[in-house]
Amino acid sequence: MKKACVHTIQLNNWFPELCDLTLPLIQKWANNIGADFNLISEPKFPGWPANYERFQIWESGAGYEWNINIDADFIINPTLEDVTDNDPSIVRAEAYMHTDVFFYPNQYFLRDGRGISMSDNFILSSWMTHDVWTPLQMSYEEAAKHCIKDSRQVSEFAVSLNIARYGLKCSGAVKDKNKTYHIQSTGCGKSKEDIVELAKAKIKEMGIQ
């Protein structure tokens, strides 16, 4: 198996002004830790939100010891540690959610009982925890009915369902939090111009050359 792959979604040349700032940094970090970089630019799940395309990792990441999913609006300092230096039996993420706040109960959430859900913006998985990328066996319309707040969260529903269904252990992914920053560009209420200026300011603040 290859060591690792970093996967990032950018469909239909999404927000190029921001991605021109963030993607080179993500790619440079991937290179620094000896990982391949996979830009998910072609949809394979028609009718689903763009963020669900991360489940292409189920197939494209099958040949790797580690898979790292990072949203395109994440600023990564290329000097960030190698996050694959971790216990492969644990799925790791940069943000957690309370299951009962975002998703309706089902047999897997109730049986698991932990109430742990993961934000899908930064997820680290290994060959041992690859089940976290199992695509849903239902339509988008059916999946959306499981989401309490926003049907766009079907991606996070799928991740969280797999955590409960397979009993996957969870923890944080990054030790040095000062070397990552999530712009959270979707639904933030800011203009594209303001988002780009925020990204530039954060990159400067983080001392990234």
Which residues does each PLM region occupy?
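Short beta-strand-to-loop acidic/aromatic patch adjacent to the donor-nucleotide binding site
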Residues: 64-75
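N-terminal anchoring/stem segment of glycosyltransferases
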Residues: 1-56, 60-65, 187-209
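Catalytic core and acceptor-binding pocket of nucleotide-sugar-dependent glycosyltransferases
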Residues: 117-207
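Hydrophobic/aromatic beta-strand patches that form the interior of the parallel beta-sheet core
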Residues: 7, 38, 68-70, 89-91, ...
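Long, low-complexity, intrinsically disordered polar/charged segments
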Residues: 1-25, 85-89, 120-121, 132-150, ...
